[in-house]
């Protein structure tokens, strides 16, 4: 239902000017990638205990509730228009003047590189009133009714792009796709942005290298994540100077569209890694970045810091130099690029026998140093949580004792759909739309692993105090086809009373093929305009059950899911149509644990042991994101070379690093960029 419109030069020009003026008020104090010193109150404390949401978030929610109340009433009225009687439930939710009766909606978009960014964009477009056709033929208005929007890795590229471009719409991105400096111009890889113009590519990488080197020369630790984030940003903020070189994540709080609560509350998710280790599991500390704070609800930290002043040298939240703070460290590209999963997955490919031997030798030597020096992760130094006292006494103080904080992609703990910030009891979310674009299986489709791991986390030490509804094992997900269509989990709160608290109902929206083979490789770093539009269109169809052709009543069922928690809490009679919906979409506890055949088995992307190259040679497999659907010849030919997905079968690396330093030398900044470029070119990722 998404239709491309003719490019409009005047609109594009006005948009570019507005972005420039907006960014001018949100720039780093140094007007560059380098953080700078700013004044702050002498008595300021930048860290708080995670006992509740922040005062800033609470004040923002009061505004947002007024906005979502109007939008949600309109959406539910349309969704239940064909119901026999929905007046009682709607009257109770909206006419009592009690905001606590208002269902609180959240959307979480998984990681998965550009595959997830584009497919997730289609899902959000289907929920957005601003999308052509979404109000009449989609779930238009649902996004306007949403309070929280979280993303991990590729999902965060989507969330960050929309939020930091003044809450632009996917429709607007589509309308301007043929213009110069258009958002998400993926025609050429971020590695070779000039295409055949090698001078443009060289200039881009020179700018990136200079930016990272300038940060390093200012005595800040840098890593490949800095280079990666800078490279990515040019596709997210093309109208801004050098891809928003000074644009900060905290600038979202200064945008009028956010201040007026006219957009959801954006959240980026990352995983912490204990100094001296390389293992990520369910006990990893999960961090979130929102417009006001970054930190973790987990008992291993239990703290939040003011995201605007990251980079400030503190002890227990107090700046070591009173009255002076650091700003600009929270560079938008850096936070959106706080990811190493894509690096780790692509780096495994260097064992491929088709690479020149000198490249293989060089890469192995380089990657060994990377792993030991932590250059494969994002380094937040100085540590904003240095010497904090809020963590649970049962946990090691490794995080708060360290001078640096080390973060990796939020999906490296196998919880690729970033729901953890949304299931916190303090946020009181009623329903989560979980958009899963993971490549869990051989053909790069999801198998529910992320939800399974989140469910399991509540029973390990780190998950104490959290709740998540019951979900089946991954074999059941696949055998019952739950990974190919929308499924509701946790439909009946009466069956969840043995959990810590009643968790949100989860509407699972897995990536599936409707009009396009959207199971593209995470290593596919370029998409033609036609492919981008097709990926987004397919995402629209995922959210709408193929434009409601698979189920004309699906919008009504979404409405039933939204009101379910409040309906049960308030003891309101459900419309009979909702009972039919729940029978059709709620998982009823049925299991089918029959093992999957080898051709379908899972390919879980665990942390890679880059020091064991010899033992892992031969383990890599070339896997194909194949499709039975016929595509146009141009689409097929342009994507076939990028459809290989590597197998991540290496064991978890538990050996401690011998060197905890994380500072790239002056010469290695440019060398790192060159290595990244060379490896990606030879591995076919470009």
UniProtKB/Swiss-Prot annotation:
GO terms for molecular function: lysophospholipase activity; phospholipase A2 activity. It catalyses: a 1-acyl-sn-glycero-3-phosphocholine + H2O = sn-glycerol 3-phosphocholine + a fatty acid + H(+). Pfam families: PLA2_B (PF01735). It is a lipid-anchor; GPI-anchor. GO terms for biological process: glycerophospholipid catabolic process; phosphatidylinositol metabolic process; phosphatidylserine catabolic process. Glycans are attached at residues 56, 82, 129, 166, 221, 283, 313, 351, 495, 519, 547, 571, 588, 614. A lipid is attached at residue 659 (GPI-anchor amidated asparagine). Its EC number is 3.1.1.5. Residues 1-26 form the signal peptide. One of its GO terms (cellular component) is side of membrane. InterPro entries: Acyl_Trfase/lysoPLipase (IPR016035), LysoPLipase_cat_dom (IPR002642). Residues 39-592 form the PLA2c domain. Residues 660-686 form a propeptide. Keywords: Cell membrane, Glycoprotein, GPI-anchor, Hydrolase, Lipid degradation, Lipid metabolism, Lipoprotein, Membrane, Signal. CDD domains: cPLA2_Fungal_PLB. It is found in: Cell membrane. Sequentially removes both fatty acyl groups from diacylglycerophospholipids and therefore has both phospholipase A and lysophospholipase activities. Substrate preference is phosphatidylserine > phosphatidylinositol. Does not cleave phosphatidylcholine, phosphatidylethanolamine, phosphatidic acid and phosphatidylinositol-bisphosphate. Mainly responsible for the degradation of phosphatidylinositol in vivo. Belongs to the lysophospholipase family. This is Lysophospholipase 3. The gene is PLB3.
